[in-house]
Amino acid sequence: MAAFDFAKVKDPTFFKENVLNAHASFRTYASREEYRTGSSSLALKLDGIWKFAYAKNYTSAIPGFEKTDYDCSGWDDIHVPAHIQMEGYDIPQYANVQYPWDGREDVKLGEIPQRFNPVASYVKYFELPESMQGKPIHIEFEGVESGMALWLNGSYVGYTEDSFSAHAFDLTPYLQPGVNKLAVQVFKWTSSSWCEDQDFFRFSGIFRSVWLYAIPTVHLEDVSVKTLFAGDD
């Protein structure tokens, strides 16, 4: 069974694992009536209250929280989507030409801060509605800053960076009947943060919506547009 290795967060040659290919973004409906009402029986939005634990670095983060027998009922509650800095953890930071860790720690090119690099651990329990059961299930994170590792029912699913793109994973092999435990660990800075250094405020966390999608046997996944020119026009 594959396992998450924190060394991946620090490796500038590594930025994703088990992430589904990017594709066009649109909603899928099981019928015309669902389309008319805008309510799909093939989608479950996981936005809302999640359980949450904050740590100032990976060494301080709670080990084994993703396991099914780990009790996180005493953890804090946090809103998803939200930047953790807007929920009372860490503070927002504005940086222009400097890297956000400048002055805190001497970080070599391509590496990441070790002493202060906040880690956000999230847990969400869910049950699939009957309309989604028995179908392949994908999860899509529309925005997570800046890197995240994902587990379902204690099994490692995958890892990704790139804060402002949507990322999807196949949860089908890890699902169980009844209640499922989804665990996410978010890293404020990864080796990719060297490439995301621009003139903006720095935050971290699951800051856009999270969706579960049931995938029908026959479905449209991607679209493309190709323009053909006639003559010299």
State each model region's role.
Residues 95, 100-105:
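Aromatic- and acidic-residue-enriched carbohydrate-binding clefts of CAZyme catalytic domains
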Residues 227-233:
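Short, solvent-exposed loop/linker segments at the N-terminal edge
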Residues 61-80:
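Short Gly/aromatic-enriched secondary-structure transition segments
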Residues 42-43, 68-71, 202-203, 216:
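Extracytoplasmic/secreted proteins and extracellular or luminal domains
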Residues 37-41, 62:
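A short N-terminal beta->alpha junction/helix N-cap motif
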Residues 33, 104-109:
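Short glycine/threonine/proline-enriched tight-turn/helix- or strand-capping micro-motif at secondary-structure
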Residues 2-21, 28, 33-37, 51-55, ...:
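Accessory beta-strand-rich segments of carbohydrate-active enzymes
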